[in-house]
Amino acid sequence: MKLALDPSMYRDDLTLEEMVYKTAELGYEYIELSPREDFCPFYKYPKVDSAKIKQLKRLLRDTGVKLSSLLPLYHWAGPDEDRRQAAVRNWKRAIEIAVELEVDLMNSEFSGSKYDPLTSEEKFIKSMDELLPVFEKEGIKLNLQAHPYDFIETHKGAMDMIRALDKDWINLVYSTAHTFFYDDGKGDIETMFDEAGDRLTHVLFADTYNHKAAHGLRYIVNPPDAKVTVHQHLDIGQGEVDFDTIFRKLREMKFDGIATNAVFAWVDERADESSRFMLKKMKEELGLA
């Protein structure tokens, strides 16, 4: 099993070099390299050259830290066609970067529009038609997650699409912070993990509150029909996700994939404390302490 840090809490304050050293200082062996402006930015063309890639590989060797995966985010499901075409170009470059980094796994989201799901699905499949041969040629695996505000928000929707793609190298990312979006507020971990089975190869750990609680009055948004979604990425125990069941199921399943600390809430307050707590908690509950 790989225990990784998503360094999002550090990306705006630390250089790439400082981020790698910080990861080592916190005790993590792996980095899940999420978007940052000087590497693979959110939704924009990658801003990294061969020299920076070599620098990163040297930093990783010096610290003993490894990359568990590269996490790009691009609008490959449109629904705007210009955005989709740009996303495919961005993905092709990101795959080249993964190959240069000697990383054989990328993870991402479906990245379409909640309010135009049919067009988004059509655009996503069109992008897959172009990109699947590139992934296969380069030997890169892909893990995908449903996400709030995406055209696929639910666990069932994610599993249906992963099965539709029908590639044994495309599997599921389960983000615990999205649990209540995955099944419309029920938070039924047991059922979702049983449904995923051996497709569950990647878990992002963070806690959240149930946005469906209090008859929908947990979060009050003005105007009432505003097109928004709300969730958190908190330390385990600070929200309402059933982590007892999550860890029990992962132990029963003999989960041996990637477990990533994906807490983002404490950038300005207690990032180091939170990151150390999450690593300790994951190790203890996954039987790695």
Swiss-Prot record:
User: So, what pathway does this thing act in?
Assistant: Polyol metabolism; myo-inositol degradation into acetyl-CoA
The record, for SUPFAM superfamilies, names: Xylose isomerase-like
Q: Which InterPro entries match?
A: IolE/XylAMocC-like (IPR050312), Xyl_isomerase-like_sf (IPR036237), Xyl_isomerase-like_TIM-brl (IPR013022)
Report the domain of life of the source organism.
Answer: Bacteria
> Which PANTHER family does the record cross-reference, listed alphabetically?
HYDROXYPYRUVATE ISOMERASE, XYLOSE ISOMERASE-LIKE TIM BARREL DOMAIN-CONTAINING PROTEIN
Q: What is this protein called?
A: Protein IolH
Q: What is the lineage of its organism?
A: Bacteria, Bacillati, Bacillota, Bacilli, Bacillales
- The encoding gene: iolH
